[in-house]
């Protein structure tokens, strides 16, 4: 197993991307992350994942803090609260990421990639479970002369080489999960052509330096975990445990997104109290038998991952 418990106190985290207002799916995952940590006597760190600062105005980060606090999902450090493990905004961490990126370069594992997204999709390459194209290795073995010629026309992104190796981990919600790095993931991005670091590297570096011992997030990120465990190993960092919660779907089966304004907390706050929203989400995820109003604190004693469904959760018609 690549992931194991970290000794000492449990540290969970909220890691939202502030590209819009929070919706019910975000809130459900945040509630589960908070309950998992608090039921073990742990702490919560709030990290703002605004790697692409242009898409993530600071106003949305401020609003999501207000929304989480209103619901009673209070964090112990991070965000505007600060703490000993800052910066807590990824847009302020480029120098930190650069240091770790250079460690991977020094191992001879990083190479430039000149492929466009359109080219990859046109190649009909297979996709990972999170919808990304499995990279076919087009630029993996370019010669120095070929790289120099391609640079004249286009700035490259950068990928990390992966071996033909299976990685298995025990997910706290979904159970054992195995993927082959080469066949199921492929060489993946570390840095975009514009210099912005990729999600996979940033979250590994941040979770490690913030002392996070438990990562709770949506099941759409399940296939990211093997890539991240690979990076933890290469960088000599301690990996946390993982629990991937089922996604929350609209009554018609659609996946909720920030474009679903009717399911955004901005609109829901006009119709329901914080306790009503928490109670309805707890009911949808099997944490209480009825959608009765409740506080997050009241759910701590009875929380167990065994109660949480393994399949995506479809909101009952009329619940919200």
How would you label these PLM feature ranges?
Residues 52-62, 250-254, 301-309:
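Short, mixed-charge aromatic SLiMs
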Residues 102-106, 208, 269, 282:
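Alpha-helix boundary recognition
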Residues 23, 86-91, 152-156, 200-205, ...:
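Noncatalytic linker/hinge segments flanking ATPase motor cores
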Residues 2-124, 128, 219-220, 224-237, ...:
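N-terminal Rossmann-like or analogous alpha/beta NTP/dinucleotide-binding catalytic cores
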Residues 1-21, 39, 44, 71, ...:
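Non-catalytic terminal extensions that flank enzyme cores
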Residues 61, 94, 117-120, 132, ...:
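Alpha-helix initiation and N-capping motif
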Residues 118-257, 264-268, 317-320:
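Active-site cores that bind ATP or allylic diphosphates and position pyrophosphate for catalysis
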Residues 49, 80, 244, 268-269:
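Sparse recognition of residues in long alpha-helices and their boundaries
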